[in-house]
UniProtKB/Swiss-Prot annotation:
Lineage: Bacteria, Pseudomonadati, Pseudomonadota, Alphaproteobacteria, Hyphomicrobiales
Annotated zinc fingers (FPG-type), start-end: 258-294
Family statement drawn from the similarity comment of this UniProt entry: Belongs to the FPG family.
Catalytic residues identified in the record: 2-3, 58, 284
Binding site for DNA: 106, 125, 167
Any Gene Ontology biological process: base-excision repair
Subunit note: Monomer.
Originating species: Methylobacterium radiotolerans (strain ATCC 27329 / DSM 1819 / JCM 2831 / NBRC 15690 / NCIMB 10815 / 0-1)
Function: Involved in base excision repair of DNA damaged by oxidation or by mutagenic agents. Acts as a DNA glycosylase that recognizes and removes damaged bases. Has a preference for oxidized purines, such as 7,8-dihydro-8-oxoguanine (8-oxoG). Has AP (apurinic/apyrimidinic) lyase activity and introduces nicks in the DNA strand. Cleaves the DNA backbone by beta-delta elimination to generate a single-strand break at the site of the removed base with both 3'- and 5'-phosphates.
Protein name: Formamidopyrimidine-DNA glycosylase
Amino acid sequence: MPELPEVETVRRGLAPALVGARFSRVTLRRANLRFPFPERFAARLEGRTVTGLARRAKYLTAALDSGETLVMHLGMSGRFDVALPDGSNLSPGDFYLEGAQGTPKHDHVVMAMSTGATVTYNDARRFGFMDLVPSAELAACRHFARMGVEPLDGLTGAVIARLFRHKIAPLKAALLDQRLIAGLGNIYVCEALHRARLHPEAPAGSLARPDGRPTPEANALAKAIVQVLEEAVKAGGSTLRDYAHTDGSAGAFQHAFRVYDRVGLPCSRPGCAGAITRIVQANRSTFFCATCQPPG
């Protein structure tokens, strides 16, 4: 599933085609994605201008001059393709490996823009969705009402200590809880925990002192999360088995993975003689170095 860096890469690539443009025609080629489209979805978009394109966690939000916001989630395999008036094509945030990319039969939403560009949403697995929400109620809508803090918006050890205090859940599980920190996924949590030298099964509450102040480990983790995400965004995300940019290029951060999907390979930390191992937590693979990420 596309994580925060991949969705941010999509946003940056898609913004030039959407922001300031008007929906001239919207064609739905099926009645639903993961969920049914909102009532009169195409009609509520047509004639409206996109005034801004933002990201909240793993969601894209396009503000419209109608007072509504188009909320979009890519699911497991969603992607956007942009056909420009000059005949060239872009695929903003194309993180899927060749062979896993969508085909025209999975083009479910086609949006003709006033600029002459055509933006197509393709989703082979149909786990993505689109919704329309009153802009004034966006923060309180069902998608975002219980969502946690943005990790790239001032995340500190003090914030982590406040969120994790008294929690007995494993550290990795707490980091994946979107009600605490929104937008983190399996890949970047594994990478951040390795950089912070923290075991994924350590109790989340251990990052807060009895008085609620952050431990050194909480400060290290906050720094690692921000570094990993910023580096991944700069690299254009990670190209995965199921995920592909808007310009058709691949994300490159997978080449910087230190633990993810590297079972049996030597730990990349200078001076560490350990190897990367894998365990399963909540039906998800966890990759870490048992030598420099010891338990307890």
